[in-house]
Structure formats: structure tokens, C-alpha cells
Amino acid sequence: MKIIPILKKLNKETPAEIYYAGKYVCSLVRRKKSNSVEIVVRQIQLQAVSKYLRQHRENLKIKRIRGYISFFADDTNFVIRNPKKKGKYSPYFTLKEDAKEKIFTINAMYLPISSKGVKSLIDVYRGRNDIRNRKIKVIGKADKVTKQNPAIMMETLSLAAHLNYRIDTNLFYAIKSNHALIKKVSINRVRFEFIKIVMSQRPSKYLKTMHASGLMHVIIPELSICDGVTQNRKYHKYDVLTHCLTACDNAERDLLLRLAALLHDVGKPQVREEVVKGGKYKVTFYNHEVTGSKMARRILRRLKFDKETALAVSDLIYNHMYNYEPNRWSNAAVRRFIAKVHISGKEIKRLSRMPIFLLRKADRAANGLNLSEISPRQISFEKRIRQIYNQSRVLHIKDLAIDGIVLMEEFKLKPGPTIGHILNYLLSIVIEDQSMNQRNVLIEEASKYLSTALK
């Protein structure tokens, strides 16, 4: 027997009052599906609910945590609890008391489990009206709520981004007034809500709100100061911040890509120069990708992203400014690029889906000049990469005629960074001239490298 029919049976056969609650009711009102169900049970203890469920459903693994029980069944996550009041749970608290514990009006609605449709909706704080108006509003006075619980400020933005709703005016100004309090919130919580914003359907809309409220200035000041930093109108319609936010919109919904797109030009304010040459004025951002990659790594580590994510995003930013010129790039130059961005047999089959090229696509689409997402030169570049890749025997360290073990045996070296440095040096030689990939030749070159390095 499925869980919902069991609960309906419990509701009918006992004094229990059982209600759908919280985000699940919000989804029902919005006519959206949800794989998580929140249930509030009155007039009966949770222990009795657990017992009844086990009697009617075999092998049900129920977790008991203070105030509620949870389990997975029927492809759904269930949370069942008693009403809450001032941090305590009791089957004898009212729904009105429970609703007061919620943060947002749209999550403070209840529906009797026996109801057909939402006509019997119990709407304590007019949440349904806010859903109609596509508005995020808190229960109580916004200024007081955000001061008492500053985490609500980022949660407001992430919820609005998830639903594509606007933020209540009073709530926005409360966030703006109290934005500095976000420093008191756990960085893990801030990152959690930030990721939800970045991964939403249209992140730029809510990242702009994050900036306008002052939250971005506290959390990612390096990005905030990009506001108003103008660029060459020939290549960019927008300032640096708007360009970065638009690139984030245009990037596919992959966390690494979205983060790289958002931060790809974060180094520009640091290196911006205004130049007059030949009577013509222009703005330059030389090596902004180098500066930006270092900044992005620091930003992401400060936000407690894992090391692998920070390095991957930093690597994408560092390499995103490649400038392929067909007549100037030799075959060796193409091989160097292949090695640099780690193109292997797996990637060559779906080259246009490589993160570095997807980032370039998002970057180009965000310049505001209505250009095609992929330039003819990029198409030509990918074609040539395939051609060179298929012609080349050595493009990665693993393709070399010798490995680290040979180096250690030949030169009596111990495992360590030196081995990697030598192999990278040898790879650079073979990339320039594929015929150099011979054991004796590479050992001789390694010997030269070591004699130079040890001087």
C-alpha cells in the first residue's frame, strides 16, 4: 500500500488531523510536481504515526529526528512532523502557531490530506495571493526578520531565483539596510544559496539584485567593483559586470561553466588602462585572464568551494582568451593548445562540448553585439584541432616514450615534483617535433634539463 493512502486511512480511522504543508503545498498551488512531501499531523503523537505506517507498509525505514520522522518511499521523500511553536513540537499546537514559524508566506499554507484540489486550502498569511503576484514575502516585519536571521537575505534571493519571482519591496529594502549582517552567516550556508542562484534559469536577474542590495559587495567584492567598468564598444556593448552576468545566463546549466562565465573577466578592473595611440583612444585589459584566474581561485576558496572546483574554474578562465589565427598558428601551436586544455580522445569526438569552448560561446553571446554564438574562425579552429589530433602520436605525458620510472632509474631520482617538471619539459619538445619521441633522445634531453636545472 502506498504512503498517501495509508495516511488518508489514518486520518479517517483515528482522531488524527493530517495536512500537506510547506513547500509541497506551494508546489500544488503552482501546479508543479514535487518529489518531496511535508506532512503536519495534529492530535496524534509521531510514535503512533510511525507504528501505523509500519503496520501497513513492510520494510519501511523510518528515521526519527527531534520533532519529525523522515523516510523515502514511492519515489518520494517524506517528512512528517507535529506542529511547531517557538522551537518545540506538539500534536496539540495549532496550524496558525505552526505557520508563524515559517519564513515565507508562500510556504505557510496547509491542505487537509483528504482534500480534492486546493479548494480547502488553509492560507494563514495570504501565501496564495503572493503566488498569484509572483512575489517573495516574509512573515512579520521584514527588517526585524532579516536582523534576527541574516541567512534569510540569501535564502530570499535563491528562492526568488528558483521560482523566477520578484522580491517584496519592503523585504528588498530590509536586505539592503541589513546586508552587512551577512558576515555573521556561515560561509557554507552563503555558498549553498549562492549556488542555487547561479544555477537558476536566469541568474543575472538575481545577481543584479544581489549587487543592488549590497550583498555582492560583502560576499564577492571583486565582482561588485566591475560595475561601471567600461570596455571597448567595438567588442562589448556592456560594462564588465553586466557582461559577466549575461555570460552566466548564456552558459549551460553546469556549475563549473556558470562559475567560470560569472568570473571570467573579474580581473579586468585590476589591469584596465586607457591608451591613446595614433590619435585614437582605446581601453586595454592585457593579461586580465591571468589576473582573473588567480582572483577566481581565491574567491572560490574563500567561499569554501572544494579545491578541484576552484582549480577547474581558474583553469578555464586562464585559457579562455586564446586567439586562433589560421595563418599564424603552426601545427605545433595547435598541439600546444591541445595539451594545454587537456583534449583527449574522449573530447575530440565532441569537441564543441568541451568546457573551454562552451565558455567561449557564452562569452561571445554576452557581448551584446548580436553576433552568432560560434564564429567561422572557431569552427575552422575545431576542424584543425581534429585534423592535428588525428595526425599526432604524442600530445600528452602518457604518450611519451619514457615515463617517471625510467627517469628515476636512469638518473637515480626520488619521486617528487622534479619528475613532473622533466616530463612536462620533454612533452614540450615532442609537441614541437614529434620525431623526438624516442627513448634515447628523451633521456639525452632529460640529462640536459637536469644539468641546467642543477646549476
Where are these regions (language model features)?
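Catalytic cores of the polymerase beta-like nucleotidyltransferase superfamily
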Residues: 1-455
